[in-house]
């Protein structure tokens, strides 16, 4: 399972870079875990080059590397090229169970489903594996004659799965009578801080988008003992904010310079991020932290980004190979829709008034001020499995 977390985190960094190429001056927020899980359901039905491309983009090959080691290259290639691995499917099952383990300290809702034109009949083996490993059932629908109604039904289902936080995943033109297969993935997360911000300390302050432009934000503040890490070569400082029970944490990466985000984004790799955010790189500081209250609701049609990353055949009617899903020809992936919702406030990641507290330090720790009043990167990590649940960039209020 550790190898699957590595694959998801590698994908997180690369996908974030790809989104950033076409999101100049905009916020970014997505779930690498959510996208990987939903695409794994499609991957289960692929063969040949379609499977190999998906494996490469999603770093599923890393799972075989991790399991077999360098001395089993031939076996690894055979397993990876076939695009299938019971270990990988089982890893997704185990990882999802750990992440979705319900506790009183957080709520995590995920809506994952494949919709396929009803003229394509599923193999029984595919249906069985989907139920076993993903707890999911592909839906056969009538895109040809009722695409508008199907879109409404999809949106209604996603809304019901996310507590109506994500009610309109598919836009009006998302599907039509030529649609053969659509993948939908939506996530909603609500967590409570281990140390809440005091509402009384929240004040309006300027957020500096660049050296010449700023916008007002509601800026929260706290004085607390927090874990801090320094990235000296990129003049960036990071801080970890735990949610209750410490199963999840928010990791904030703040460049020292107002316009330092581009340099950080260009330099970041999975290996560097893993090193920077590891426990042995963190020290405890007495931190005066300023963090904006913000809400993010981001939607993506992932086809363009995934194509650019090398996953082309799955979207090509003449090349897609979904023969492990169905015996019918010409089935291809029409679109992949992904939407996330996040709200950061005094209590945590969803609205409610909280009465925060400040700490008086009996053991003197180094003191530092961290003012997130300019663009920064952030992650929400599942600490038990070291999986990046959400990946984001806050550029502008």
UniProtKB/Swiss-Prot annotation:
Q: Where is this motif: Nuclear localization signal?
A: 74-77
Its tissue distribution reads: Expressed in many tissues, including brain, heart, kidney, liver, lung, prostate, skin, spleen and stomach.
For site (Reactive bond), what residue positions does UniProt give?
362-363
Q: Which InterPro entries match?
A: Serpin_CS, Serpin_dom, Serpin_fam, Serpin_sf, Serpin_sf_1, Serpin_sf_2
- Stored Pfam families: Serpin
Q: Which CDD domains match?
A: serpinB10_bomapin
Q: Which UniProt keywords apply?
A: Cytoplasm, Nucleus, Protease inhibitor, Serine protease inhibitor
- Where found? Nucleus; Cytoplasm
PROSITE patterns per record: SERPIN (PS00284)
Q: Which GO terms describe its molecular function?
A: peptidase inhibitor activity; serine-type endopeptidase inhibitor activity
* Keyword hit for Mitochondrion: no
Q: Which GO terms describe its cellular component?
A: cytoplasm; extracellular space; nucleus
- The UniProt record lists the keyword Kinase: no
Q: Name one GO biological process term.
A: negative regulation of proteolysis
Task: Please classify the protein's predominant subcellular localization into one broad category.
Answer: nucleus
Q: Which family does it belong to?
A: Belongs to the serpin family. Ov-serpin subfamily.
What does this protein's UniProt record list under function?
Answer: Protease inhibitor that may play a role in the regulation of protease activities during hematopoiesis and apoptosis induced by TNF. May regulate protease activities in the cytoplasm and in the nucleus. Inhibits plasmin.
Q: What protein name is recorded for this chain?
A: Serpin B10
> What gene is this protein a product of?
Serpinb10
């Amino acid at each position: 399972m550790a190898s699957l977390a590595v694959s998801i985190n590698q994908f997180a960094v690369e996908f974030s870079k790809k989104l950033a190429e076409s999101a100049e001056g905009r916020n970014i927020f997505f779930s690498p875990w959510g996208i990987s899980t939903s695409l794994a359901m499609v991957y289960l039905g692929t063969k040949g080059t379609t499977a190999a491309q998906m494996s490469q983009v999603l770093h599923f090959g890393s799972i075989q590397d991790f399991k077999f080691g360098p001395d089993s290259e031939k076996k690894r290639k055979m397993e990876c090229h076939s695009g299938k691995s019971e270990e990988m499917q089982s890893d997704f099952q185990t990882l999802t169970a750990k992440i979705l383990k319900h506790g009183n300290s957080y709520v995590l809702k995920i809506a994952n489903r494949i919709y396929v034109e009803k003229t394509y009949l599923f193999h029984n083996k595919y249906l069985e594996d989907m139920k076993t490993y993903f707890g999911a059932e592909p839906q056969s629908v009538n895109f040809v004659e009722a695409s508008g109604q199907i879109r409404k039904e999809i949106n209604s289902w996603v809304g019901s799965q996310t507590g109506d936080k994500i009610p309109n995943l598919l836009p009006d033109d998302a599907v039509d009578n030529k649609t053969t297969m659509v993948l939908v993935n939506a996530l909603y997360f609500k967590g409570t801080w281990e140390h809440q911000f005091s509402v009384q300390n929240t004040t309006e302050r300027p957020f500096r988008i660049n050296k010449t432009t700023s916008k007002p934000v509601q800026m929260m503040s706290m004085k607390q003992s927090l874990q801090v890490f320094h990235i000296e070569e990129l003049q960036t400082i990071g801080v970890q904010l735990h949610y209750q029970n410490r199963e999840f944490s928010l990791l904030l990466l703040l460049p020292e310079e107002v316009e330092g985000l581009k340099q950080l984004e260009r330099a970041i790799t999975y290996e560097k991020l893993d090193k920077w955010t590891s426990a042995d790189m963190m020290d405890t500081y007495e931190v005066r932290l300023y963090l904006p209250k913000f809400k993010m609701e981001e939607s993506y049609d992932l086809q363009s980004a995934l194509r650019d990353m090398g996953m082309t055949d799955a979207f090509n009617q003449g090349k897609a190979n979904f023969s492990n899903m169905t015996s019918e020809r010409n089935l291809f992936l029409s679109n992949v829709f992904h939407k996330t919702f996040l709200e950061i406030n005094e209590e945590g990641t969803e609205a409610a008034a909280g009465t925060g507290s400040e700490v008086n330090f009996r053991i003197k720790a180094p003191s530092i001020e961290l003012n997130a009043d300019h663009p920064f990167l952030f992650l929400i990590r599942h600490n038990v499995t070291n999986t990046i649940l959400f990946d984001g960039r806050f550029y502008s209020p």
